[in-house]
Amino acid sequence: MKRFLLLLILGGLFLGGFRPFAFSQGSMSIYMGQLSDQSEISLVTFAPGEELHAAFGHAVIWVRDPLQNIDKAYSYGTFDFKTENFYWKFLKGTLPYSISFNSMNDLVYYYSQIEHRSIKAQTLHLDPAQKNIIYQALEQNLLPENKNYRYQFFHDNCSTRLRDIIEKAVPNAFQWTKYKNLSGLSYRDWMNHYLATNSWVTLGMNLALGIPSNQKATASESCYLPDNLSEALEMAEVKGQKFADSPLLIYQAPEAEKAGFDGLGPIVVLQLLIALVMFCSIQFRNNPRFLFRMDVLLFGVWGLLAWFIFFLATGTDHQVMSWNPASLMLFPLNFPLVFWFARASKKVIWTHYLSVVCVLFLIGLVWSTLLFWPMALAGLPWGIRLFALRLKAS
């Protein structure tokens, strides 16, 4: 249950869709020789799945050499639940991630028969030297002293590592400035393309992300998503010739049923809560005891949420969570001050406090709305009471 709750809150952001385990630990079987002329190297892309951990897809580099009896699919983004202090390191952004490899048959079976996700492969057109550059880089990363790295959702994940390895072997393969369809959107925009708008996970992930996620991603940077890397590879050319074969469909997953509108999603629930708060504010305007209890609940819960977001922004190594305007909208200081509200309602300092918080709330609300509009709904329930208290204090 603890694992489920942690993944529900933060899993989409930290895991993306990137594989959280290895089917086998083959890192001891490292072959540092040269590939033969019959070897082939492919990028294999696994489509997004229905589960949270699979929301953004996955990608591996597949190296096969029948003469050397090599069949390895290299995957970045592997981690071990048995790591000491796993949950704390996971939350702090200090959990070590690593590279692993499996046979392609194992991967195809798992992703097709267990997770029911489509699979496509693109064979790269490489000369022998380029093949060995890629292969040696992967094998070097498997060494114990090299295999672990610090994962970053947007900048260092299973897809960006493969992009960098390919670029190192063939520097001019990608003409990034020509890929207009892969540029112009922010990291957050690309992420939200893969998520349902009316979803608690989507809302939570957007609340957790800070200003860095709104930076416009270049075509190269957009390849933090495996689908975008596959698309870039399809457009890549070397000396006027296609750098990779067109995607070969290895497995076509059955078309999933389109999910209907979720009546318990955040858009509906938060709108109902906003309406309820407005109704109670009017209906019980002459019942200070009831309103005080409602304020304690709203300001306390929203204040705790604000402290959690503030911790993610300032107390972790997740750079994409820094400078988060949601902290202004939800305002952490509400939690320690919540029990003071009613008793200070006649004091001048109370009026000044409410005025300052109202301004900060509006700044955070407008800012958050521009980033992802459902976030505004998350701030309004307590915001309505904030302005009601400010009017009462006038």
Regions found by a protein language model. Give the residues of each.
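Positively charged n-region of N-terminal signal peptides that target proteins for export
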Residues: 1-4, 394
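Activation targets extended, charge/polar-rich intrinsically disordered C-terminal tails
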Residues: 140-339, 345-349, 357-394
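A structural motif
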Residues: 126-139
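Glycine-rich catalytic cores of cysteine/serine-nucleophile enzymes that process amide/ester linkages
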Residues: 37-116
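Boundary at the C-terminal end of the N-terminal hydrophobic targeting segment
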Residues: 18, 22-26
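Bacterial N-terminal signal peptides
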Residues: 7-17
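A eukaryotic "domain-start" boundary segment
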Residues: 25-30, 36-39
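Second-shell loop/turn segments in exported
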Residues: 49-50, 117-125, 144-153
